[in-house]
Amino acid sequence: MMSIRQRREIRATEVSEDFPAQEENVKLENKLPSGCTSRRLWKILSLTIGGTIALCIGLLTSVYLATLHENDLWFSNIKEVEREISFRTECGLYYSYYKQMLQAPTLVQGFHGLIYDNKTESMKTINLLQRMNIYQEVFLSILYRVLPIQKYLEPVYFYIYTLFGLQAIYVTALYITSWLLSGTWLSGLLAAFWYVTNRIDTTRVEFTIPLRENWALPFFAIQIAAITYFLRPNLQPLSERLTLLAIFISTFLFSLTWQFNQFMMLMQALVLFTLDSLDMLPAVKATWLYGIQITSLLLVCILQFFNSMILGSLLISFNLSVFIARKLQKNLKTGSFLNRLGKLLLHLFMVLCLTLFLNNIIKKILNLKSDEHIFKFLKAKFGLGATRDFDANLYLCEEAFGLLPFNTFGRLSDTLLFYAYIFVLSITVIVAFVVAFHNLSDSTNQQSVGKMEKGTVDLKPETAYNLIHTILFGFLALSTMRMKYLWTSHMCVFASFGLCSPEIWELLLKSVHLYNPKRICIMRYSVPILILLYLCYKFWPGMMDELSELREFYDPDTVELMNWINSNTPRKAVFAGSMQLLAGVKLCTGRTLTNHPHYEDSSLRERTRAVYQIYAKRAPEEVHALLRSFGTDYVILEDSICYERRHRRGCRLRDLLDIANGHMMDGPGENDPDLKPADHPRFCEEIKRNLPPYVAYFTRVFQNKTFHVYKLSRNK
């Protein structure tokens, strides 16, 4: 963080609890060997205590989340089909590939089934390892088959315990990052406590276990911790190389386990670019990190059989553009303030233009359309034009992709996290502006630099990185609620670091003329301890009540549907329906699907729009022809979609389909002038009347309070 450059005399009686220091005072060491020995012993003791607490708090968090999951579902007591149904939507799809690998006679056949899969999308053979990020399921299935644990641990428990184990690593990485920034493990303890007490806003692992982000975010946290250490000045060559290795491995694993990796790392690249441009980060270290990002993505691209979406990512185009712009624009960091500011703006414009140019060229060469729905969504979200695009509106109408709800800040304030975060953020932003202005003013004036060395605050590179990181990811979370988990966890780290930072308190006490070394020590330890006591007092009873509250999984209609499919349909039958439900059909029954929730493919999106015409105003023969074009044998209709009330008018699935088809929406309210009344009634409603035009094409074979299954005729 901010360090006063002017050194003061260090007294032998002062004992530091800091993390391994960046510099050693050789003169003091020669004069006071006994003092230095005691200092080293204290540091070893501090490291031991801090490390032990880090491991314990990580394991306790893991056990806590696993217990919540068990208590909420009574997972150990319910049937296998109920366990599988509890993996909702895309979670069930991912878990099905773990199950598929375990059921394969051999590993080779299991791999072959994933590479040449013809059950995930009917009438198509796709490479699942290319299309999806499921190497983690492959790795776990291999481990389960190889390790001698089959007699003691069911496959589903091996899977979920691995995910909860990763949560232990996640919390430990957050703890270490805060410790590295502040110099005391007390900061890490506070970060971990905040993470747990704000669980609703920091993680959703206990009810979305197989979700890709639950695999990826622990590695992302490790990467941030490693980058924080790497950006420290004066690292030993061996330490630097080992840290680079840790950054590379964690970046690679993060990229391998989540399809949105490229967008998160693009944010990181923007952080590096900002700091490098403002001379707040060594350019050499920024170059290393750019290179690691590109290398990791290219390795993942190879493992995913040259997935074109990775090659066409904005991250690769941006990082290459930064390298090219550096070569084209020399002496970027010299000259007066206005001179440097002009060069910086030109540099920014050049990088932006090169990024867009390279990205468009790559996408045209590869004929890449897989990510176009994301850009359509962003364009509509930020008001750059209204759209009737079904895919974009599907995202816009989901709460998870909306703005961060205001009540989030109320919950974060209850734990004092938000107040502490704003306090620390305000101070560091002011210091960052001062440092950036000084760096741009006159980098060639040695007198100016000398003056700064003697009396001006400075921003450490690792602190500057985490500051810009938290700001950019904060904007991301504010704009898209689903991404809040990337911000709130780092918020815990940044707030706890600031409260335990000696530089923060030194700056604050000096500004109110109360500076005293003892006061700094008192403030940096007493404030976090008081907050920890407050958190224990206020939230411990609630956490104990939460752990004692027992519920049970209950979804009899879905269980009945899955059992009926298993008992009454051929194993090669093809099912159509909603993406979310079909993921469960794939997992519980192994039947072939027409569509599924992994939405990162343009042809799948077109197929899904066609299948969803079952909820639109279409003629029975049109719907039948569309479904049969995908080889559909059975279609599942859900009352919860056909008569949906959860979303407002204009955001119900049937409304999105009506708008995309140019039809007027149901119910009172305005319609766009060019929308016209449909020629046919809504299919999902009319088919239940068993009228001749519908009976000729569809025969009802199953029905309960939630689902209606129809068998398609083949002779039409």
From Swiss-Prot:
The keyword RNA-binding does not apply. GO terms for biological process: protein glycosylation. Pathway: Protein modification; protein glycosylation. It is a multi-pass membrane protein. Residues 185-197, 216-230 dip into the membrane without crossing it. It is an enzyme of class 2 (transferase). GO terms for cellular component: endoplasmic reticulum membrane. Widely expressed. Keywords: Endoplasmic reticulum, Glycoprotein, Glycosyltransferase, Membrane, Transferase, Transmembrane, Transmembrane helix. Residues 65-154, 257-262, 307-308, 360-414, 486-487, 540-716 are lumenal. Changing N118Q: Does not affect endoplasmic reticulum membrane localization. Does not affect mannosyltransferase activity. It is found in: Endoplasmic reticulum membrane. Glycans are attached at N118, N704. Its EC number is 2.4.1.-. Residues 1-43, 183-184, 198-215, 231-239, 280-289, 324-338, 438-465, 500-522 are cytoplasmic. It holds the Pfam family Dpy19. The C-terminal luminal region is essential for C-mannosyltransferase activity. C-mannosyltransferase that mediates C-mannosylation of tryptophan residues on target proteins. The reaction occurs on the luminal side of the endoplasmic reticulum and involves the transfer of a mannose unit from a dolichylphosphate mannose (Dol-P-Man) donor to an acceptor protein containing a WxxW or WxxC consensus sequence. C-mannosylates RSPO1, a Wnt signaling regulator, preferentially at the first Trp residue in the sequence WxxW. C-mannosylates the netrin receptor UNC5A, preferentially at the third tryptophan of WxxWxxWxxC sequence. This is Protein C-mannosyl-transferase DPY19L3.
